[in-house]
Curated annotation (Swiss-Prot):
GO molecular function: RNA binding; tRNA pseudouridine(13) synthase activity
InterPro entries assigned: PsdUridine_synth_cat_dom_sf, PsdUridine_synth_TruD, PsdUridine_synth_TruD_CS, PsdUridine_synth_TruD_insert, TruD_catalytic
PANTHER family xref list: PSEUDOURIDYLATE SYNTHASE PUS7L, TRNA PSEUDOURIDINE SYNTHASE D
Enzyme class name: isomerase
Cystine pairings recorded for this chain: none
EC number: 5.4.99.27
Name this polypeptide is given: Probable tRNA pseudouridine synthase D
Lineage summary: Archaea, Methanobacteriati, Methanobacteriota, Thermococci, Thermococcales
Amino acid sequence: MDYKQFFSNFRYLSSSKGIGGKIKSKPEDFIVREVIPRSVFRSDQCLIYLIKKQNWETMAAIKEIAKRIGIDYKNVGFAGTKDRHAITYQYISICSENLESIKESIASLNIEGISLKFVGRGKPLKLGMLIGNHFQIILRGLEDPERALERTKKILKELKLKGGFPNYFGSQRFGERRVINHEVGKLLLKGDFEGAALKFLGEYTGDMTGDEARKDFLKTGDVEKALEEFPNFLRYERAMLYKYRETRSWKKAFAVLPRPIVRIFIHSYQSYLFNKALSRRIEEGLSLNEALSGDIVCQVKKGLPIRNKTFKVTERSLKFVNERVKRGEAMVTGPVFGFASRLADGPMGKIEREILDEEGIDLNGFKMKQLPILAEAGGRRELLIKPRGFKYKSSEEGLIFRFFLPKGVYATSVMREIMKDH
């Protein structure tokens, strides 16, 4: 199953016909620029660099930089992961001894697809320490660009009346060709480490390098043969296979992966469940831009959702809350399930509990007692995307879109609602 098949399970918010087209035909068609808070620079503890990268996953780029300058990659911090199939600008912090020596080493660094610019000193960066991202996206392959422009206007007009774009987690959370991350996450959550390993190592599409090796491993379970056949670029798969050969434990094999990588599986499953809840709310005709009794809403400050400041709507507070929603001071949320999740009541609460029942999961499972490093407390996430500075125009290449999104919000989900390509 590819991401188009996967996302066909989730409802569009607008009914207007999409414009089709293709994003990411070239890396320069998808440009991302990270925005971090100024408070990061209120320290001289670490070196702060702006990385420009192309055809590199964030974690792989950080490991390569650390290896070249001779430090542990754990001393390199970052605020957000960025797409490989794009040109991305993001910040990293380097916190270690002999910072001046490291600075000299970086000045002479030459890595294809990566450039680094020193921007100052600051605090160690951690995942989530960003405000958001600016995007520039070129949509190519349009049959009739002028008609596409008119359709875009119509879609945007409809979405404005409905409060924004549906805030689905994007394809990067699940995998674009092997859409399995959420399935691996569910198996890990249930403590089925062997099943999760077979899914991660053995699932194949039929048209990717390494598929024959995956297919053979799924059939035979032969670890020695897999180590001979799995290509070197499948470094995480190979790391797991080596660890399993050493320990005969798939749990320990998952634990050998870098923590940000292995947590992707649980995050992906949480994201799938959120998307399912959001889609069902749309399907049932419930507003995303008007609170219902029992809904949980989050505060909004300077146009940005404060996801950890939430309150439950009652019949008594309903009118007051919806006045705040209209003023842009609050937003209706959906569930990011975890062991400390606060579920909604009313119609949304019914949806949330139905999904937990359908999936056969208990919130306490997110404590991940067998592998506590994967524990997830959960939280809430706004149901709508309200892009800032949204602009678009026609060009020789196609349609060019520019906008800013808060952290954790996906540009691909904005484009999906306009393209409707699945």
